């Protein structure tokens, strides 16, 4: 029998209690976003520490709220998220607690363009998505059907297409994540310097091409390639041509092809087909520049590894049971199978990696 008073058993029991109660973390984060806590603290003035009672009047409370909210319960949420590095706690005297934003908390502050990571948090915790999580085990038992489909009767992207609210939140969430990521890679990656014509496969409204062309004026023409119904709604962008089509059939020709967050939701065989079509569209020496999450070879307890593996389970649960985050070795194999002899990774962002495949 184990000695239950030993240090190792005490730590084990504590760890499993934390894991069992882990749902408190995303749900409290979701609550913080719904209430607008980050904006309330930031707009209070230079991120000055505020107490729960001082934050409360600044929150997004429903108009029918009669008591003005509960500062004690707000403080409970603030304390819990402080333990995860979202807020900093400042003790005033022996009783009062005040809170400011950490760098993590600042990602939830709405910027001048109306964007932040807040929409990403909300998008991940919509009611339809939450219904899928109790069914994660079915991805092992019945991998042919996604837990999301089992819970909602149809695929996530099908529902996004039918619901303006879900689609709008999805687009805002992706923009909130994409813009800072694109700024980071455009500052740290020079692979677009020699490109004359660039295709963005799955480029949606063309926002990434807009940013690339602004940073690299040598790119004479950008081709935003996506489904016909998607590019039909895309705005006019100087230097960008919107082209509708199917990446599983063919891809427009160019010096280089850019692809962001596309491969992770497709199976290995589907990825091979997409990448083969990209290979066929490139000249010798041309590049496929893909931006995807890359799993580490070995599993550890770092924030990066956990974030990537959590994202992998999200893909499995919500989008495709056999879509997945991949290791560098798996991407090399996909590239070789599509004909690309040369592969180079660029680890500029901690979550998304630039993967350069050269023909």
UniProtKB/Swiss-Prot annotation:
PANTHER family: O-METHYLTRANSFERASE
Name by which UniProt lists this protein: Nicotinate N-methyltransferase 1
Organism: Arabidopsis thaliana (Mouse-ear cress)
Molecular function, one GO term: nicotinate N-methyltransferase activity
Catalytic reaction annotation: nicotinate + S-adenosyl-L-methionine = N-methylnicotinate + S-adenosyl-L-homocysteine
Membership in a protein family: Belongs to the class I-like SAM-binding methyltransferase superfamily. Cation-independent O-methyltransferase family.
Taxonomic superkingdom: Eukaryota
Pfam families xref list: Dimerisation, Methyltransf_2
Recorded consequence of changing residue 21 to S: Reduces catalytic activity 4-fold
Keywords on record: Cytoplasm, Methyltransferase, S-adenosyl-L-methionine, Transferase
């Amino acid at each position: 029998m184990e000695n239950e008073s030993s240090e190792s058993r005490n730590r084990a029991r504590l760890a499993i209690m934390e894991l069992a109660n882990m749902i408190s973390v995303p749900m409290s984060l979701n609550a913080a976003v719904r209430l607008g806590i980050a904006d309330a603290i930031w707009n209070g003035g230079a991120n000055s520490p505020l107490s729960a009672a001082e934050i409360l009047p600044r929150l997004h409370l429903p108009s029918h709220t009669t008591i003005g909210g509960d500062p004690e319960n707000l403080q409970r949420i603030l304390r819990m998220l402080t333990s995860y590095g979202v807020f900093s706690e400042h003790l005033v005297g022996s009783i009062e607690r005040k809170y400011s934003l950490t760098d993590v908390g600042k990602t939830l502050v709405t910027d001048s363009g109306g964007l932040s990571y807040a929409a990403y948090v909300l998008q991940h915790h919509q009611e339809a998505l939450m219904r899928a999580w109790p069914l994660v085990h079915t991805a092992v038992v019945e991998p042919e059907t996604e837990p999301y489909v089992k819970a909602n009767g149809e695929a996530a992207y099908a529902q996004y297409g039918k619901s303006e609210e879900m689609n709008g939140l999805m687009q805002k969430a992706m923009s909130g994540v994409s813009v800072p990521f694109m700024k980071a890679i455009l500052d740290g990656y020079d692979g677009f310097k020699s490109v004359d014509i660039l295709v963005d496969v799955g480029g949606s409204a063309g926002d990434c091409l807009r940013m690339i062309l602004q940073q690299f004026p040598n790119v004479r023409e950008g081709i935003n390639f996506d489904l016909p119904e998607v590019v039909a709604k895309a705005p006019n962008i100087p230097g960008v041509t919107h082209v509708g089509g199917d990446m599983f059939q063919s891809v427009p020709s160019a010096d280089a092809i850019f692809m962001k967050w596309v491969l992770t939701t497709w199976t290995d065989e589907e990825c091979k087909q997409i990448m083969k079509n990209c290979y066929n569209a490139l000249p010798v020496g041309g590049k496929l520049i893909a931006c995807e999450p890359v799993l580490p070879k070995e599993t550890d307890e770092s924030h990066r590894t956990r974030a990537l593996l959590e994202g992998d389970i999200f893909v499995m649960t919500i989008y495709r049971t056999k879509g997945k985050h991949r290791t560098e070795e798996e991407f090399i194999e996909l590239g070789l199978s599509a004909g690309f002899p040369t592969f180079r990774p660029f680890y500029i962002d901690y979550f998304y990696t630039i993967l350069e495949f050269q023909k």
